[in-house]
Amino acid sequence: MKKLTLLICFILISAIIDARQVEQYTIFELELKGPSAGNPFTDVQLSAEFRLMNRSIFCEGFYDGDGIYRIRFMPDQTGEWTYSTKSNIPQLDSKKGSIKCTNPSAGNHGPVKIRNTFDFGYADETPFYPVGTTCYAWVHQPEELVNQTLATIGNTAFNKIRMTVMPKNYDVYINNEPPFYPFEGSKEKGWDFFRPNPDFFRNFERRILELQKIGVEADVILFHPYDFGKWNLDKMNSEEASLYLSYLIARISSFRNVWWSMANEYDIMRKTDEEWEKYFRVIQTYDPYGHLCSIHNGMAWYNHSKPWITHLSIQTAYLQDIQDWRELYKKPVVIDECVYEGNIPNDWGNLTAEEMVNRFWISYCRGAYCTHGETYIHRENILWWSKGGKLYGKSPERIAFLHRIMTEAPAEGVYPLHNQWNKETQLIKDREWYLYYYGNSQQAMARIMLPKELKFRLEVIDAWNMTITPVAGEFSGRTEIPLPGRPYVAVRAKVINEN
């Protein structure tokens, strides 16, 4: 265990820059020595103000054990930043300095933000098309399995992963003990929720940084209802939960690839609307960077019009309502759970690969994004959805094919045609680009309407076989073309630029 702790520290030190020059959207870390007596997690207040010209960003510090305090800062603008600490402990107060923020290196696009109301983009305005996956408790597995998970996701197109902070207990599929526990104490003796365990959080943030290296966003689930009395880590009261949140946020809000998911199936948990609002306000107070933030539903719906909700994180199989949700909330829609590809007996875990791919295409062509999960029976109960490891399904490569289609679409001006009941879904950019998806129908012909005064080239796309076949000729106005008469086919039209 001691060797593992030292390894985690080494990796974090190499990833978090403790220097006076950092590139934009990376992490500057200030390390200070202070008191370890009493309860440093609650007795010591520590923060810093970072200034650049007329801008100020306030960052909370945190206790990292053994008398060490840290303040982490992600500069979002190049230039010479100055900082000054503030603390109720003289030893930590009024520490001043400066850092130079340089241009970001290749591949560093900054954190993901909302783009054009319904879409996502990095801070440098590079579009981000989320194709996510679900791997709830992968960080709480043995090192060998964690490394296998990272290798697997690194060889897919998945660029967002839904993951829980706390370990998970769910039936036979996942109930293992984590390598670290989040607080001092034990289930038998009771947890001291006012004393976080730095080793646990170092391990967690190490995994986020490893995801960052392979270009994957960490959709961090802060609360979940899947303890069922195994550890009683879900027994925090409101004050304890607020301290847990503020501590975690101080540690990882400076990581550019973090998203906040307040809870998974929030309505199953015994918390009031007032409590959820309090926790959202904790995020708003302690996250100076405004990371993306949402909440995931079971049966009941949260009020997504609240200002702290940046996008919808929805569990549903009723994809025909996507356009209504877009129009109602004026926010991006992410179908973060639409049932998983797999073969377990639970009704949420036995989609065919074909239907998983179909739901991704329907979501995209209705103006949303979708998230994958996989639950194939495994002799050692290593299911991707819960523990990670390897992927066995047939949908990931076809989701990668869809991601390619997304990146080839116009970056601006694309919207879904509101066509609620028909199987055909349409995503268009007026007079320039059209994508028609026919779902699980098997029609032998496509009938589409194009602007009469413009000429278009057409392609037939097979979403399952991952082929793109050009249609000979140029097309305008009312157009009919043959289709192969099987499901999961789309037609793409691109205007011919006469210039």
Model-derived regions, located:
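Solvent-exposed, conformationally flexible loop/turn segments
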Residues: 22-27, 476-478, 486
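Positively charged n-region of N-terminal signal peptides that target proteins for export
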Residues: 1-4, 252
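Extended acidic/polar, glycine-enriched regions
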Residues: 49, 55-117
